[in-house]
Regions:
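Cell-envelope and extracellular/periplasmic
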Residues: 22-329
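Bacterial Sec-dependent N-terminal signal peptides
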Residues: 1-23, 326-327
Length: 329
C-alpha cells in the first residue's frame, strides 16, 4: 500500500493525473523505485546552487519556543522553506501572508505549522546563508509532529493505528494525512526538480527514550529516504540532535547516550551536542536561545563534514560560557 501511495505521488508531481486516479490505476503495478526513476526526466533542471535539507522529528524539531522579534526580523530570500501544510495568514505564531502547501517562502518562523515555534532549522539555515557564497541558496522541507516516535516517521507506519493515539496527536497527524513519510516525499519530489539534497536534520528521541533499537530504526528511515530519492549517503549525511541535556535538567537526557551511538550504525551520521543550551520550564523543550544555539551547531557540524570554512563564531558567546560552566560540574 505504501509503495502504491508513493508511486502515485511521483505521478502527481509529474502532472500526469490526479492522486486518486493514480492510486486506482497503478495500485502496486510498479515498484516505487521505478516511478521515482521515471520522474527524474520531468520538470526543470535542478539548480546545483539551491541546497536542500529535509528536517524531521518531534516537538523540538516542530518548535516549542515562541519566536522573538530578532527571529521574525529575518528577510533574506536565500533561505527558504517549502510549506508542508497550508498556513492561514496571521494565525497562531505565524505573522504574515498565507502559505500554500508545496510552495517556497522566505524562511521566517514558524517553519513547521502556523502554531509551532522556533526550530533548530531556523538558525541552521541562517548560519549557512551567513557562511556560504551569495550564489548558494538554502531550502528546507520541514515535517515534524510533537510527541511522535521514530516509528511514526517510518515508511511502513500504518495510519489506521493513529486512532489509538491522544486526540491532540491525531489532530497534528491529520495535517499530514496521517502519513508523515509520504508528506516528506510529496515535498521532496517536487523540490528535487529545483535543487539538490545536501542533508537530513533529525531531532527526535524523547518518545523513544531509553530504546536501544532507536539507531537501527533511524537507519531504516534514513535508508528509505535515500533510496526513494535516489541519493547517496556520503552526499547526504544525517544529523541528529541531542535532547535537552542533563546539565540543564533535561527529563529525557538519558536518551543522549543512545543518540551519541548513531555513527556506529550510520557512518554518514553526526550527533549534535545540546550541552549548555538553555531549555524551557518543562525541561523537555529548548528556549528560543537554546533553539538558536542548537541550530548553529547543526550548521557547524554540516560545514565541518563538507569541509566548508566558517566565517564567524557560530554559537552565542553566553551559550558557550554556559556550556563550559556545565562541564566543570
Amino acid at each position: 500500500m505504501k509503495k502504491t501511495i508513493i508511486a502515485a505521488l511521483v505521478m502527481l508531481c509529474c502532472g500526469w493525473m490526479t492522486a486518486t486516479a493514480q492510486i486506482e490505476m497503478y495500485g502496486g503495478a510498479q515498484k516505487t523505485e521505478d516511478f521515482l526513476s521515471q520522474s527524474k526526466q520531468f520538470g526543470t533542471k535542478p539548480d546545483p546552487n539551491f541546497w536542500l535539507f529535509i528536517c524531521i522529528g518531534q516537538s523540538n524539531m516542530e518548535g516549542a519556543a515562541t519566536p522573538e522579534e530578532q527571529d521574525y526580523a529575518w528577510n533574506d530570500p536565500r533561505f527558504q522553506v517549502m510549506a508542508a501544510v497550508d498556513f492561514p495568514a496571521n494565525t497562531g505564531r505565524h505573522k504574515g501572508e498565507a502559505r500554500k502547501k508545496y510552495q517556497w517562502y522566505t524562511a521566517v518562523p514558524p517553519l513547521c505549522r502556523a502554531h509551532s515555534g522556533l526550530t533548530p532549522a531556523d538558525y541552521f539555515g541562517r548560519t549557512l546563508v551567513e557562511n556560504l557564497p551569495d550564489s548558494i541558496r538554502i531550502g528546507v522541507i520541514h515535517v515534524a509532529i510533537g510527541g511522535c516516535k521514530i516509528e511514526h516517521l517510518m515508511k511502513e507506519y500504518d495510519p489506521q493505528t493513529v486512532t489509538k493515539e491522544a486526540g491532540w496527536f491525531q489532530n497534528i497527524m491529520h495535517e499530514y494525512e496521517d502519513l508523515p513519510y509520504t508528506r516528506v516525499m510529496e515535498c521532496a519530489l517536487r523540490a528535487s526538480h529545483q535543487g539538490v539534497f545536501k542533508g537530513i536534520l533529525l531531532h527526535q528521541g524523547c518518545s523513544n527514550s531509553g530504546d536501544k533499537r532507536w539507531p537501527a530504526m533511524v537507519n531504516k528511515v534514513y535508508k528509505d529516504i535515500l533510496n526513494d530519492l535516489h541519493l547517496e549517503a556520503k552526499e547526504v549525511p544525517i544529523m541528529a540532535g541531542e535532547v535537552v541535556n542533563a546539565d540543564c535538567g533535561g527529563v529525557c537526557a538519558g536518551m543522549n547516550p543512545i543518540i551519541q551511538t548513531l555513527p556506529e550504525t550510520i557512518p554518514t551520521s553526526m550527533w549534535i551536542s545540546s550541552a549548555g543550551l538553555p531549555c524551557g520550564p518543562d525541561h523537555l523543550h529548548f528556549s528560543a536561545e537554546g533553539y538558536r544555539g542548537i541550530g548553529r551547531r547543526y550548521a557547524e557540524a554540516f560545514m565541518k563534514y563538507k569541509g566548508i570554512e566558517k566565517k564567524q563564531q557560530l554559537v552565542d558567546v553566553k551559550v558557550e560560557k554556559k556550556a563550559k560552566k556545565a562541564k566543570k560540574k
